[in-house]
């Protein structure tokens, strides 16, 4: 899988350029997000890189916000998260996936890791990363595979009381996350 996409942010003024490359023993995903909250005095640029193993488990995450605030996380893929210096982050224990608030790519991780059958539901603990603050917290999310149409798959996505139906392509990348993100064709 070598793919490049652009997503439009439909909640805020902004967009993301995203690329994913399959290497010998891993995937490398990179994104550059530009968005504005309110007026241009509250504009942000976010760059991130996610190193994944071939089963879509996050191994390493680097995020840089506004060219100077950064976050580096590492994971063993079994629910243990570490800072750059190797220090364990206890409050994230048990979470397997990341959810970076400013990108729809995060949804691809649990979707691509599982072999879904129609009407199957999966429950996940996610490391939620709030952008631009880089605050970390563990959150529960669920996906239910509800429909397919050719190469398109539809999932009911839920986090706490929020629920929506998202559409992904054959690579598991978001095409439509209603009123939040839409892929530019």
Task: State the predicted function of each range.
Residues 16-18, 46-48, 69-72, 163-164, ...:
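A structural detector for short beta-strand units
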Residues 155-185:
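C-terminal structured interaction module
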Residues 37-85:
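Hydrophobic/aromatic-rich structural module bridging two neighboring secondary-structure elements via a short loop
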Residues 1-17, 23, 71-152:
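Solvent-exposed helix/loop surface patches that form functional interfaces
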Residues 1-55:
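Short N-terminal edge-element motif at the start of the domain
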């Amino acid at each position: 899988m070598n793919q490049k996409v652009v997503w439009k942010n439909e909640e805020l003024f902004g967009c993301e350029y995203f690329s994913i490359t399959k290497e010998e023993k891993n995937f490398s995903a990179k994104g550059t997000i530009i968005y504005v909250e309110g007026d241009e005095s509250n504009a942000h640029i976010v760059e991130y890189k996610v190193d994944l193993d071939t089963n879509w488990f996050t191994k390493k995450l680097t995020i840089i916000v506004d060219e100077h605030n950064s976050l580096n996380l590492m994971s063993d893929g079994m629910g243990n998260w570490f800072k750059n210096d190797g220090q364990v982050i206890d409050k994230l224990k048990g979470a397997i996936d990341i959810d970076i608030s400013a990108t729809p790519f995060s949804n691809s991780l649990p979707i691509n890791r599982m072999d879904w059958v129609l009407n199957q539901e999966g429950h996940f603990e996610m490391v939620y990363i709030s952008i631009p603050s880089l605050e970390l917290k563990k959150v529960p999310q669920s996906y239910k595979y509800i429909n397919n149409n050719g190469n398109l798959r539809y999932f009911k996505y839920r986090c706490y009381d929020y629920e929506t139906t998202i559409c992904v392509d054959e690579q598991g990348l978001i095409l439509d996350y209603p009123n939040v993100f839409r892929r530019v064709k």
